[in-house]
Each structure stands twice: as C-alpha cells, then as structure tokens.
Amino acid sequence: NKKPKSKVLILERGILPSGASTKNAGFATFGSLSEIISDNKTLSDNSVFNLVEKRVLGLELLKKTIPKANLNIKNYGGYELIFKNHFDLEMLIEKYNKLLYPIFNDNIFFQAKEKIKLFGFSKTKLTNLIFNPYESQIDPGETVFKLQRILLSKGVNIINGANVQDFDYSGNAFEVITKNDNEIIKFKSTFMAICSNAFAKKWFPNEDINPGRGMIIVTKPLKDLKFKGSFHYNEGFNYFRNFKKRVIIGGGRNLDFKSEATSQFGINNFIKKSLINDLHNIILQNQEFEIDMEWSGIMAFGSSKEPIVKKLSDR
C-alpha cells in the first residue's frame, strides 16, 4: 500500500509453493508449556514473553489478512501430553500463566487429566494433559492459496517453477537468474527480498541459519477417532492433530539431529518408526490404523529463536 504503482514479482521454485508454510500440517500454535520452560533455560522471562507474543501476533495478522470464513480455522484448543510429573506442574502452570497473562488477558494453561481416558490415550504412560484454549488448526494449503489470490488481486505476479540460481547487482538494478529444466531466464529489479527461510543459507553462508527437516505422517480415516485438537509432547518436538477422521503426526527431529540438519527433502525411517510406535502405544492404542501418506518440510533454525529480518542494503 505504500507504493501502489510498483510492480512486484514473486519467484517460487516449486510448481506448488514448497516452503514450510505449506507443510506445517496446520498447527496454529505458539508453544507448549514444556517448550516454553525449555526456552526459559536460555532466554530471560522478558525474551520468552516477546517470543510468544510475536507468534500470537503473527496468527492474529493471518486472521486479519484472510477473512475468518475463508481461513476455515478450527478452535479445538491445544494439549500437551505429560509422561512424568518430574516437575512441580501446578507451580509452573501458575508461573507461566502469570508471565503470559498480558498477551491474552487470561490464563492459558490448565490441567486436563480427565481427558486422557476420554481421548483414548494410554493411561499407563501419561500422567496428565495440559489444555490451552487459544490454539487452533488451519488448512495450510487453502491458506496459502487464499493468500495468493489476495496478492494477485493487488496486481502482484507469481511465477512458479522458477528456481533461482544466482543474482547480481550492477547499474542500480538486480539481475536474478532462474533455471527451469535447461532454460535460463533472467529478471531485473530495482529492489529484492530473499524470503527462502532455511534455503537462505545458500546466499548468506555466514548467517546463523541452519536447516532442520521435519516429517509428517497421515493415517487413513479411522472408524472411531476420539479426540479433536492440536497436541504436543517432548518439549514441542512431537506433535499431532485430528484432520476430520484422520490423525496427522509429525516431528521427532530431536531423535536424530545430525541427519535432519539437511535441506534435502526425504523421510528418516528411524524417526518414522518412532512416530508409528507412538501412534500404537500412546495415541491410538487398541485401534488398528494404516498410513496413507507422508512428506517432509525444511525449517530454519539458529542459536536464537528470534526471526532474522534485516536489510543488507538500501535495495
């Protein structure tokens, strides 16, 4: 809106958008209690507050950008699976409810042990559930397509299948070189922004940006799925949710950090086996299920969880 006459072009290497935004499996969440506790070991209370607030404001911006009716958001709430009460749960819930209260003007963490049986989870492996009423689900594919329609309506052009090979700056303009099959196509622009998340390491090798692969598994529809919501465990490294009568489960990167520190898409069979075991032994015990599909996505990580947004030049 600042420069309505400017021509804007987005170059996307995939036939369909292939970034982490389309592969996050629809978790509109901002951090489980154990993840926030883990962050607080290296971050101050103020930094933890700011981190959660940014995530919440990002979700609010998404809701403002896309009309709620089109976002198809499901407010089922979020839950964390607690396996052992090796910490003072009541004290920590009170502490972080107090810390994060100004963001919501409300408490956000509540014990929900009674729902372990209701949801059909393992009563021998779980000792508690923590409920968060402010977390939701979205359809990431539909969300991205609706964002595309908004951009197109404002005159923004999008070219898919444009794999950027290199760029150069000379004569007050950028020259961006793309390749599709064996065809080289060059674009020129006065200004340029690189928004490729983990893949930005290719252009900025000295930046604190490292790839981290995550995988998602989706079951076939189940006859009797007992739960709805977004669920996390193991300090947020593992997550699952319902999608209609299916279960979407993912994560487990912490089981093999070294192999998953890659920008190559693919499935880690060791992690896949662990996720399937969790479905059998914790989440869908006494239920038969089949895996229908799987995929991977690449995220970006650094020494800090703060996003890197900065200008490298005036252009």
Per-segment meaning from a language model:
Residues 19, 23-53:
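Glycine-rich active-site loop/strand segments that organize a redox cofactor
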Residues 134, 281-315:
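C-terminal catalytic lobe of FAD-dependent flavoproteins
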Residues 34-40, 64-149, 154:
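Flavin (FAD/FMN) cofactor-binding and adjacent substrate-gating region
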